[in-house]
Amino acid sequence: GVVLTIIALVPVIRWRNEKPTVEGKQNTEGTFKAAVNLVKRPGIMAAIYISLAISSVADVLVVFLPLFGTENNFSPYAIGAILAIRAGTTMLSRLFLGRLSNRFSTFQLLWWSTIISTLCCVAMAFAHTPITLGAIVFVAGFSLGVGQPLTMSLVSQKTESSERAMAVSARLMGNRFGQFLVPAVAGSLAAASGAGAVFIGLAVLLATSIFSVKRN
């Protein structure tokens, strides 16, 4: 651990002599007020909400897929394989993201990836065999993997270069809020109606974010 930490410091030491790529602008209105004004701009809140929805769904799936598998008597091996498929296809999607971005706009990619993810979440609730669930998760992992980095791109496109650090911070704060709230709601749904209901709830969350994509 110590060796890896020291290795990680090597590029940081080299960066200390580099000049900032964007010159900082003096903030005369205060950080909080500046953040509020930034979020009020057209498209920013919608972009943050899309990011919240996609990141929350990706995290909640990791927790509730094993529970759903247990409820349907999947073997531990099958559950582990399904989780590996989700992670693997998400990673795989990043390899194709550059080519997809060259062919399609950010709006088109976000629109279709969110629709596909929504349909996959609905389908998961009715997948009662490991093979069926694994196939659905394969598609969902890819579509969620496409959507996550695009929300960062969307926030960047909506702001000036001098404001991007604050905009990205606002996006991250939205993600953390979603990662706090959505699992709590998902737990309540699972306790009342089973893990399948969680997937329906996630589909509803993604469906509401589709309208935010269109507004952008």
Predicted regions and their residues:
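A membrane-interface helix-boundary motif in multi-pass transporters
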Residues: 1-2, 188-206
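C-terminal membrane-cytosol helix-exit motif in multi-pass small-molecule transporters
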Residues: 2-23, 209-216
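Juxtamembrane intracellular "pre-TM" segments in multi-pass secondary transporters
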Residues: 15-48
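Pair of pore-lining "gating" transmembrane helices in MFS-fold secondary transporters
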Residues: 40-57, 138
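Loop-to-transmembrane helix entry/capping segments in MFS-fold secondary transporters
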Residues: 76-77, 161-171
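Helix-to-loop junctions at the C-terminal end of transmembrane segments
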Residues: 93-105, 190
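Structural signature of the two symmetry-related core transmembrane helices
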Residues: 108-123
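Intracellular juxtamembrane helix-capping segments at the cytosolic ends
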Residues: 146-159
